């Protein structure tokens, strides 16, 4: 019960010190809910035209979709997906790609600004892709 209450508080205040948006940009290609359903990790793909590769973003979002925060932005990648390794760790797996933005942690704060939890984010990748023909 204590864990459930803590998670509810976590979701209600998860993005107190992070830039926020209520818009997930692009086509959603994967959703992975946290085991308790309070948080959702989202992989989205945006197409900006024929001369540039797809841009992929990973967001953490509250289950009611009221707020979301971008934690990864990359392009020229192969095979991206997300999974919850345990109750508090998000793993982003991609074979390779160019990474423009990545946060390896996510602070969860209360409405009063007090730190409630820190969610580690692990990026599992082999680095840059060998050839542009792979995309």
Per-region residue spans from a language model:
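Sec-dependent signal peptide hydrophobic core
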Residues: 5-9
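Acidic, small-residue rich beta-repeat scaffolds with periodic aromatic anchors
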Residues: 4, 74-135
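Solvent-exposed coil/turn segments that connect beta secondary-structure elements
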Residues: 46, 63, 95-97
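N-terminal secretory signal peptides
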Residues: 24-61
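Surface-exposed loop/turn elements that mediate protein-protein interactions on large endomembrane-trafficking
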Residues: 59-68, 111-114
């Amino acid at each position: 019960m204590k864990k459930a209450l803590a998670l509810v508080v976590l979701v209600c205040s998860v993005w107190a010190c992070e830039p926020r948006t209520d818009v997930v940009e692009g086509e959603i290609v994967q959703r992975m809910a946290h085991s308790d359903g309070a948080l959702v990790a989202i992989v989205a793909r945006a197409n900006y035209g024929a001369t540039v590769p797809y841009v992929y973003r990973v967001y953490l979002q509250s289950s009611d979709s009221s707020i979301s925060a971008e934690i990864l932005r990359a392009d020229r990648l192969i095979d991206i997906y997300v999974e919850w390794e345990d109750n508090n760790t998000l793993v982003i797996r991609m074979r390779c790609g160019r990474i423009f933005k990545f946060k390896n942690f996510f602070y969860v704060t209360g409405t009063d600004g007090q730190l409630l939890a820190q969610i580690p984010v692990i990026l599992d990748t082999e680095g840059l892709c060998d050839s542009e023909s792979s995309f």
